[in-house]
Amino acid sequence: MALQQSMAMPMMVVSDLGTAPRSSPMVQLQRMKKHLVVVAAFKSRTKASPKVDKSNKNKSIVEDGIFGTSGGIGFTKENELFVGRVAMLGFAASLLGEAVTGKGILAQLNLETGIPIYEAEPLLLFFILFTLLGAIGALGDRGRFVDDATGLERAVIPPGKGFRAALGLSEGGPLFGFTKANELFVGRLAQLGIAFSLIGEIITGKGALAQLNIETGVPINEIEPLLLFNILFFFFAAINPGTGKFVTDDNDDQ
């Protein structure tokens, strides 16, 4: 009996050593949480930061003329070209009408003339002011003129503050030519002509031709040749599309 008991004791010890101890449910739960945290840390994905377009920051502002982009209400040179063409048509028609009828622009519209400037119609004064500001580029002259390609090079008017650039002309080269830059120049001259002829007619009661002592109220075939040439020139310049284009800040070809 004693031998049997002594043999059973080592067997129980071996059995106890070979059996793995069981952990409590709380310990297993904590181990699972740690495992989940580690898996989440390695599998989490970070979103890539959006690419920043730096081209807008480095984009140069295209300005040309006396006042530049910041000096106006947003007019581009293409807008000025349209207004100038309308002014050329209006000035040519007013000169032709005065040469035939003998009446100035305001007299043809039955507006009061021969009065002080401060007694003129407010709408008429606003129109004169708007025309003067447009003629000198104060409404905004954003953009620059780019001539059509000739060979491998292009003639580009660089932004500047010179007198000729302010009038829409190239700093170098010929003065006149049927480009959009020269159209802009002729349109501004027509705007100045309309504005000053209106101011003179308000004060003196005489039209633009009467102020220059040119005979009016005659048939078309008896109009002075130089006057007829000017009328035809403004009319042709208004309807003739010039070469080249205008480039604005947004790189749009006008």
Curated annotation (Swiss-Prot):
It is found in: Plastid, Chloroplast thylakoid membrane. Residues 1-38 form a transit peptide. It comes from the Eukaryota. Keywords: Chloroplast, Membrane, Photosynthesis, Photosystem II, Plastid, Repeat, Thylakoid, Transit peptide, Transmembrane, Transmembrane helix. One of its GO terms (cellular component) is photosystem II. GO terms for biological process: photosynthesis; response to blue light; response to red light. The chain crosses the membrane at residues 86-106, 120-140, 184-204, 219-239. InterPro entries: Chloroa_b-bind. Its main location: plastid. It is a multi-pass membrane protein. Disruption phenotype: No visible non-photochemical quenching (NPQ) phenotype. Plants missing both PSBS1 and PSBS2 exhibit a decreased light-inducible portion of thermal dissipation (TD), including energy quenching (qE)-associated TD (qE-TD). Plants missing both PSBS1 and PSBS2 have a higher quantum yield of electron transport upon the transition from high light to low light, but a lower quantum yield of electron transport II upon the transition from low light to high light. Sequence repeats lie at residues 42-148, 149-253. Induction: Strongly induced by blue light. Triggered by red light in etiolated seedlings; this induction is reversed by far-red light. Belongs to the ELIP/psbS family. PANTHER family: UPF0041 BRAIN PROTEIN 44-RELATED. Involved in high light-mediated energy-dependent nonphotochemical quenching (NPQ, qE) and thermal dissipation (TD) thus regulating energy conversion in photosystem II and protecting from photoinhibition. Also seems to regulate quantum yield of electron transport in fluctuating light conditions. This is Photosystem II 22 kDa protein 2, chloroplastic. It comes from Oryza sativa subsp. japonica (Rice).
